[in-house]
C-alpha cells in the first residue's frame, strides 16, 4: 500500500484537555487530515488511522460528561460519516497505534490505564478495528484481555499478521526499553518480534514506537528503521514521538505515517480520467 497524497491542512479539528508539560492541563486541538492510497479492499472505502489520544473531552452524547478523547472521537467521526462529510463508518477500517489513555483530569503526563472503552467505541461504529498497545495502555487483567481480543471486529496485535478482507495488517506493540516496566521489551526481543512479523509480508505494519528518519528531526528508533527500511511496498503506521511532518519515505522505499496526536483518513484514490 502506498500513500499518494496527504493534505497539510486539517479538514476537522476538536478541542480537548491534555496534560501540560509543566503541570496541570491545557486545551489543545486534535486534527484530522485526509489523504489517498493506491489500493484498498473492495468493500473498504477508507482507513482511519490514529494514535496517542492522551486526553479527555466533553462527550456530547453523554450530556457533556468527560470521557477519554478516543471515545469522543469515535462518536464524532461516525456522525460526520452519517452526515456525508466522511465515508460511511460501516465502510471504514480503523487503525489504532497505541497510547489511548488519560487521567480524568488530564493533568498527569504519561498516565497508564485501561483503554478497552476506546477500542470498543470505534468497534461499535466502524467496520473493524486493528492495532497495537502503546506503552501506557492496559486491557484489564490477563483473562479480561483474552476475552477482549475475542470480540468480533477487534484485532489487537503483538507479533501477528491478520488478513482483513485482503488487506494484510501486522503489528508489534509497546516500545524498546526495560522489560521490567509495563509496555516495554528488550531490544533483542522487540526486533525478533518485528522481524517475524515482517516475514509474513504485511501490507501495513502498525507499531507504537516507529523508526527515526536519519538526518532529520523526525524522532524514533534507528534499529527499527534498519529493520523496516528496505521494504518498498510497506506502509508503517506509528506514534509515540510526535512529528511535525506526518509522512516520510525511508531510503529503501518504505513509507512511515506518524499519527501521534492526530488522525489521518486514507481513502482510495480516484482513477485517472
Name each model feature, range by range.
Residues 49-52, 93-99, 127-136, 156-158, ...:
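Active-site neighborhood of phospho(di)ester-bond hydrolases with catalytic His/Asp-centered motifs
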Residues 1-117, 192-201, 206:
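N-terminal active-site segment of His-dependent metallophosphoesterases
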Residues 84-86, 120-123, 196, 227, ...:
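A general structural signal for stabilizing positions within well-ordered secondary structure
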Residues 37-48, 161-171, 204, 249-256, ...:
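Beta-strand-turn-beta hairpins that frame and shape the catalytic cleft
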Residues 34-40, 53-58, 102, 122, ...:
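Conserved catalytic scaffold of divalent metal-dependent phosphoesterases
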Residues 128-131, 145-151, 214-273:
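Conserved beta-sheet core of the metallophosphoesterase superfamily
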Residues 112-128, 132:
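Active-site surface patch of divalent metal-dependent phosphodiester/phosphate bond hydrolases
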